[in-house]
């Protein structure tokens, strides 16, 4: 079972610059691949896949705009996949055509994937390790157990930064007792079960 844990982070000035660059580059790649997809469809009446768009980014965009190489590759790939999801929703659910992203959006975010320990949460030092950022100070108010799958870094309109850690946790099923029970909700008591147990109102 996948579960997300959201924490506030406190990046230093250097980390804030890198985060801002990542926001901007993800927006740029989203817009460029959306425009590329639209151009191919208008010229050739052919729909291309998210893999085609990702290849276009790696072979063309990173060649023409070398500063994209300074950004976490998973963040750029996920920006393309988000564009593809919006594009697929347009055709399957007749939603509005995907819009180009603006740098003036109040909510900014990017997602990176876990691989080879590139994301780690240290509850003792209250720091989170993230690609290209190293260790970021965080308020780790809630612990978890499980395997990290991804991390989404975001900045809200107030300027605060957050990271949402997606974790795969173990799903524990309750033992089957083959015992049925009825529950009578009451006014004086919260409920009375068919086996005679009374739960009082708090």
Regions found by a protein language model. Name each.
Residues 1-202:
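Nucleic-acid substrate recognition interfaces
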